[in-house]
Amino acid sequence: MIKGYIGIDIGKKGAIVYQHPDGKIEAYAVPMIKDEVDYAFMYDIIQLMNARHYELYDCHPHMIFEKLGVIFGSSKTTAFSMGHQSGAVEMMAIALRIPYTKIPAKQWQKEMFTGVEEITITGKTARDTKAMALVAAKRLFPGQDFTLTERATKPHDGMVDALLMSEYGKRKGL
């Protein structure tokens, strides 16, 4: 069985990344209609990734996304929205018969940040996980463009996290 991996960074600024067995990487921003996630289009993206993988390799890719926990400092609205999105992603995997793993952020970050010096948020003692993720991703995927559009100048945090989650799944043989 030849495996591919779909990593999903849940959130309105999240991303969907498909890591093909040959190393090719497809990445999409979580589709939005104004301020709402376009779940129908998101489903279509995942369905297409799954169908192509199944057609080529006669098996489903494995989907990895974050198991949500308490996010200190976030509002009730944000917590509800994230939980809603997580449930929707899980149902997409179930409906498409894609095997999936929900992984706590600290678990995949511990593995993927190996060898990356700790970076702190300016003026604070907290780790800057977005900066550390970008450093890790650039080391693991040299030459990869982490922007999602031609006009973008900054790396897309959601793409970086989704790619690292897919790599975590690949390394763990999920």
Label each PLM-derived region with a short phrase.
Residues 1-174:
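Phosphate- and other anionic-substrate recognition elements at nucleic-acid/protein interfaces
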